[in-house]
A protein has these predicted regions:
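Charged (often Lys/Glu-rich) extended helix/loop segments that serve as interaction or gating elements
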Residues: 1-174
């Protein structure tokens, strides 16, 4: 019990120091990693190795943003984890406000809420590299064009079903 209380105090102090550090004109180097250390881990329903292999292999940055609750300012910071068997897929480098960051601004997740993030500028190259890693299959994809202040959904591509993915590896559950 005492250890849990001390750990709770430690994290509270870290959050307070981080909050104060953000107001400093010149932040000490020792405090620069607090944002990353305090970031939430958001587990996402995808495989990093399949969907964004260049983010894993060469640390390529892809624009990632929440695509809902756009009228609310994000109040949390997070890193992203995939849900593969080892949860080895982690994104901890992001583009925010035209600069690199170790955390992604996100909203607190509400009870029973499905929270969606969009990953942009991925393209077919990433899909070809990712192939069938972890048997996730192809994900749904959308082509959108933007002109002036409006957008148009040009095409919607359905992802693969579990049955289709299992068929690739000659598995027939019947």
């Amino acid at each position: 019990r005492t250890r849990a209380e001390i750990e709770s105090m430690y994290w509270s102090i870290c959050r307070e120091v981080n909050s104060m550090a953000k107001t400093m004109k010149h932040m000490p180097d020792e405090l620069r990693g607090l944002d990353k250390m305090l970031a939430d881990k958001y587990f996402c329903n995808f495989s990093l190795f399949q969907s964004l292999p260049d983010a894993w292999a060469i640390d390529q940055l892809f624009p990632i943003v929440p695509i809902q609750r756009l009228d609310e300012r994000p109040t949390r910071n997070a890193t992203l984890q995939d849900i593969t068997c080892d949860s080895d897929g982690k994104i901890a480098n992001f583009v925010t406000n035209r600069q690199a960051s170790h955390v992604l601004p996100v909203h607190s997740i509400k009870k029973n809420e499905e929270y969606y993030l969009g990953v942009f500028l991925v393209g077919a190259y990433q899909e070809i590299l990712g192939d069938m890693h972890n048997l996730f299959g192809d994900t749904n994809a959308v082509h959108i064009s933007v002109k002036d202040d409006t957008y148009h959904i040009d095409q919607i591509f359905d992802g693969e079903t579990v049955e289709e993915v299992l068929d690739y590896v000659q598995y027939n559950p019947k």
